[in-house]
Design a protein with these regions (language model features):
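Mature N-terminal segment immediately following signal peptide/propeptide cleavage
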Residues: 28-70, 74, 78
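Non-catalytic accessory segments flanking enzyme active sites
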Residues: 50, 163-165, 172, 181-184, ...
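Residue-level detector of Asp-centered blade-edge/turn motifs that repeat once per structural unit
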Residues: 53-54, 105-106, 157-158, 231-232, ...
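A flexible loop/linker signature enriched in serine peptidases of the S9 family
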Residues: 62-75, 91-99, 111-131, 139, ...
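Short loop/turn segments that connect beta-strands within beta-propeller blades
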Residues: 81-84, 134-138, 208-212, 258-263, ...
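Cap/lid segment of the alpha/beta-hydrolase catalytic domain
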Residues: 243-244, 297-298, 405, 413-536, ...
Length: 690
């Protein structure tokens, strides 16, 4: 729910990245065209870069979406880290997805997770297993045969073992025709994309491929995740909330378990004792330190800044040290440098997501990769090589390598599609909110748009989710599509967003729809004042918290000709015990029967009579993040009041719409709704109209 950035320390990085983003659009015959909805299925998503032990190759995933087949599929690819077009080769075959690529320590194998038929008895419904592929050729073979499947894994440093994350299983259910009933005893009993939660937990196992031996090394009524091998292979660090009531707090700590223990983890050693969440452990090369992500003020739940900390791995070695208190920016994915003297991590800062580096002493913070970009992930090689997945407004994520302080492009996955497109121009903006607070955002202008040439364009305020997230310099397909349709698209990072410090983020604590409303409206006013936006042709919308803030907007103003509220909340007390935010609701708003006035005052539903804006409402019927009952309630009220409205519910979809035809349908409905009410052109949906 949160993301990252930092100051422009390495200003020189702006030039090579921007040049790569534009120069990669090598022309084909014919004039460039505008982006369309169908380009969503032509563009591919690159992910999970992993550098080989000899630093010569980078393995990664490429995800494609097939509209006709109604599925997405991820395949493993490999490219020479030195770069060069034509060097990328696929490692896995079409027909089944592969994820979580890892190199075996000797560099011979690329392993991955996949749910494929293995040929074993009872394999009619294959579970996710660890597979291995000899990079020199041949077919992939399964390493594991775990009946319930594997959720995550990591190789031991010597390559002789793997640590697996495996979920418990139920005893056999006696009925073959009726599903097992859910018997709930937990405080937290739902999770989006999972459904009802039971008492089954994830634990760590050590698997030895040579003997097929599988040994459980943790147990108990706790979830154990994020395993990381100590460099000598003797122990494993992991994250787990082992408090008396794990569902009633965020007290995840770092623990260490001996890799060859035979007592199922009864003799664990707790490394951190912070009352808030500690996670993402990473070992120093000498095994003396563990770097991890921590929260200093856990009572602020998701508004608290994620910090980088280190702790001695040996008991009695000293207290944890928080290295980034003065940075005050959310960060993630710490990794030690090969010499152990510094730690690399991702950091959100003012609409960027950079790769940062800080010494183990907490001194000399720098940004090896920074600028008008969004680093989605990165990998370090044993020789210090760094590969990063970088997106820009003109290019979805591709893999780059860091070389002598500059980034060089390694993969060119989407060049053939991008070469024929005319994309929107993107400008970062800064303006004061109503109380004088400085707010930042981005403005997308249609291809060929000239500011100051009358008339200004119809404009759409699109609000990000979270609320603890930020718009960045990443490629944004939705914004590019709307701009191609002739709209100026306004993105604002209002208070509550990450990337601007904890005080900025916590400013909306128990006060949603107030300061953040002022901030997004100030972004609209700024676009109007500077000649981008036509004040008489405005639309608004968003998904998740973007939809929630949209609900506040349309209860407070009639300036917008159209609104789209997706997967939003509206009557907050009705969500208590129904969505998966039990703990967060109580921390921020208190118990609804004890603090009823606040719950009611914040709920946009109680101002529904003020809404006059034509509003399209959307959601998935299996969403346990922000349940569809919310948009159903708002739809019912607007229909009763005689307001122009429609409700679209996507079958079988969670908070994230995944079915390709529904993704297409949603975008087409966006365009049709805005065209009809903002442009007044009578837009229609050509997709799945029922």
């Amino acid at each position: 729910m949160r993301q990252l950035r930092g100051w422009l320390v390495a200003v020189g990085m702006l030039v090579p990245v921007a040049a790569a983003a534009q120069g990669g659009q090598r022309g084909q015959g014919g004039a460039p065209r505008l982006l369309t909805v169908d380009d969503l299925f032509a563009l591919k998503e690159v992910g999970e870069p992993q550098i080989s032990p000899d630093a010569r190759w980078v393995a990664y995933t490429v995800t494609t979406t097939d509209l006709k087949a109604e599925k997405s599929e991820s395949r493993l690819w490999m490219a020479p880290l030195a770069g060069g077009e034509g060097g990328a080769v696929p490692l896995t075959v079409p027909g089944s997805s592969a994820s979580a690529p890892r190199w075996s320590p000797d560099g011979r194998y690329v392993s991955f997770l996949a749910a494929r038929k293995t040929g074993a008895p009872g394999d009619s419904e294959p579970k996710t297993q660890v597979w291995a592929l000899d990079r020199r050729g041949g077919e992939a073979r399964p390493l594991t045969h775990v009946p319930q499947g594997v959720e995550a894994y990591e190789w031991s440093p010597d390559g002789s073992k793997l640590v697996l994350v495996i979920r418990d299983t139920f005893p056999t259910w006696t009925s073959s025709k009726a599903a097992r009933p859910w018997v709930i005893t937990r405080l937290q009993f739902k999770r989006d994309e999972v459904g009802y939660l039971d008492t089954l937990r994830t634990h760590l196992y050590v698997f030895t491929p040579a003997s097929n031996a599988l040994t459980q090394i943790t147990s108990g009524n706790y979830d154990d995740t994020e395993p990381a091998w100590r460099p000598d292979g003797k122990s494993i660090a992991f994250a787990s909330n082992r408090s008396d009531n794990p569902d009633g707090n965020l007290d995840t700590n770092i623990w260490i378990v001996v890799a060859d223990n035979a007592d199922r983890g009864k003799t664990l050693r707790q490394v951190t004792t912070n009352p808030g969440p500690d996670g993402q452990p990473a070992w120093s090369p000498d095994g003396q330190w563990i770097a991890y992500v921590t929260v200093v003020e856990p009572d602020l739940i998701w508004y608290a800044t994620d910090h980088l900390a280190v702790v001695p791995a040996q008991g009695g070695g000293g207290a944890p040290q928080v290295l980034t208190r003065t940075l005050d920016r959310n960060l993630a994915r710490p990794r030690f440098s090969p010499d152990g003297k510094a730690i690399y991590f991702l950091v959100d800062d003012h609409g960027e997501r950079d790769v940062a580096r800080i010494e183990l002493s907490g001194k000399n913070l720098s940004r090896p990769i920074a600028g008008e970009l969004d680093v989605r992930s990165f990998a370090l090689g044993p020789n210090g090589a760094l590969a990063a997945l970088i997106a820009t407004p003109a290019r979805p994520g591709e893999i780059f390598r860091l070389e002598r302080g500059q980034v060089k492009q390694v993969t060119f996955t989407n060049d053939s599609v991008l070469a024929g497109l005319r994309l929107a121009s993107v400008e970062k903006t800064r303006f004061p909110s109503r109380d004088g607070t400085q707010i930042e955002g981005f403005v997308y202008t249609p291809p060929g748009f000239a500011r100051g040439t009358p008339p200004p364009a119809p404009a759409l305020l699109r609000i990000h989710g979270g609320p603890v997230a930020q718009y960045t310099w990443a490629f944004n397909f939705e914004a590019q599509l709307l701009a191609a349709r002739g709209y100026v698209v306004i993105h604002v990072n209002p208070r509550g967003s990450s990337g601007y410090g904890q005080d900025f983020c916590r400013a909306i604590w128990a006060d949603w729809g107030n300061k953040d409303y002022d901030d997004v409206m100030a972004g609209v006013d700024d676009a109007v004042r500077r000649g981008y936006a036509d004040p008489k042709r405005l639309g608004v919308g968003g998904w998740s918290y973007g939809g929630i803030l949209t609900n506040y907007v349309i209860t407070k103003t009639d300036r917008f000709a159209a609104a789209i509220s997706g997967a939003s909340e509206v009557l907050y007390a009705a969500n208590y015990g129904h969505d998966h935010y039990q703990y967060e609701w109580e921390r921020e708003l208190g118990l609804p029967w004890k603090n009823r006035e606040l719950w009611e005052r914040l709920s946009p539903f109680n101002a529904v009579e003020r809404i006059v804006t034509p509003t399209l409402l959307m959601g998935g019927d299996k969403d346990w993040n922000v349940p569809v009952q919310n948009v159903e309630q708002l739809y019912q009220a607007l229909r009763r009041l005689g307001r122009p409205t429609e409700l679209v519910v996507y079958p079988g979809q969670s908070h994230r719409i995944r079915t390709p035809s529904y993704l297409k349908d949603r975008l087409e409905r966006y365009l049709a709704w805005y065209d009809r009410y903002v442009k007044g052109t009578g837009g229609t949906v050509t997709g799945l109209e029922r």
